[in-house]
Amino acid sequence: MNMKILVLVAVLCLVVSTHAERHSKTDMEDMEDSPMIQERKCLPPGKPCYGATQKIPCCGVCSHNKCT
């Protein structure tokens, strides 16, 4: 009886780990194809900027509170 339970637990662990591995590979492929990952947003020249503390960086350099 105990042996059957051990075998059942081992098989369930194997199935769950295989399922998780498949999903992690699929998620990585989706992430590589995602336009959100490939596209970097930045502020164009002339837009106001505040240095390193701003959420969206300048495409160039922040100089005198303007992107250049």
UniProtKB/Swiss-Prot annotation:
Tissue: Expressed by the venom gland.
One GO cellular component term: extracellular region
Cell compartments where the protein resides: Secreted
Signal peptide range: 1-20
Segments crossing the lipid bilayer: none
Protein name: Omega-theraphotoxin-Hs1a
Stated family: Belongs to the neurotoxin 36 family. 02 subfamily.
Main location: secreted
Record function comment: Reversibly blocks N-type calcium channels (Cav2.2/CACNA1B) in rat dorsal root ganglion cells (IC(50)=40 nM). Elicits no toxic symptoms in either vertebrates or invertebrates during a period of 48 hours post-injection, when it was assayed in vivo by direct injection into mice and cockroaches.
